[in-house]
Amino acid sequence: MNTSLINQKNQTCIDTCNECAMMCEACCTECMSNTEMAGMMGRCMMKCRDCAMMCTMTAMMMARGSEYSKQMCEMCATICDACAMECEKMGNKMEACKECAEMCKKCAQECRNMMR
């Protein structure tokens, strides 16, 4: 991507959102593949899917300089926080959830930085 059109602060947030989306998808896939835990993982998987979608949309809107980028970052931070809380509940059972929670916290903070 031509980052000359995107300042470094925006690029950092875009990269973090994209990384978080991938981490959430990986966590969701890991949860689905764990048959003995599948029944307990429903909320975690739903939060991960919502978070992945929101992170992807936020990154795309920021990349094209949307006038709604700050609002998207605010919503993204909220959803990342919710996903992190849900993943933390399962973090002692699954490493993917623990890693996802940490990435979601990082993404929420980057999105909050964009609102300043």
PLM region spans:
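Amphipathic alpha-helical hairpins
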Residues: 1-116
